[in-house]
Amino acid sequence: MTIFGSNIVSTHVDLTTALTRDLLLHQAMLRLAAEPNALFLGQNVQYDGNVMFKHLDGIPVSQRLELPVAEEMQMGMSIGLALQGFLPINIYPRLDFLMLAMNQLVNHLDKLVLMSKGEFNPKVIIRTKVGSTRPLNAGPQHTQDHFEALRLMLESVRGLKITSPS
């Protein structure tokens, strides 16, 4: 499982850095989409509604599954899809929303290898954004940065790899 977070806290990012980061994130999503079993799921994966939507440009709609705001269900669905051979790429528009899926992440996905005696080792990719105030300020609920605290907690989760582009 990989958590791929965009840690963008500063509101003062120069244009070249922002464009380079956007290009890299878009290319990463296209690379994942090249996998025949890849499925992107979450809020605003089929309809523009957040800044992460633009990184899905060029990915076929048939590889996107639009979901309601139900973060724990989304993670649970991803685990089930992974067990069926899919490569689920979860899109959580904000880190705050990922925290609502922690039950599935640490109590189910983390333990499936042990519970199945090694028969199942589901792969799930999670994409989220941390503390962004651009292109719009989302207010006090969605601009805090708990990434470091979450990273420290998730270091104990087996098979988890956390990446964060600078």
Short names for language-model regions:
Residues M1-S166:
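Thiamine diphosphate
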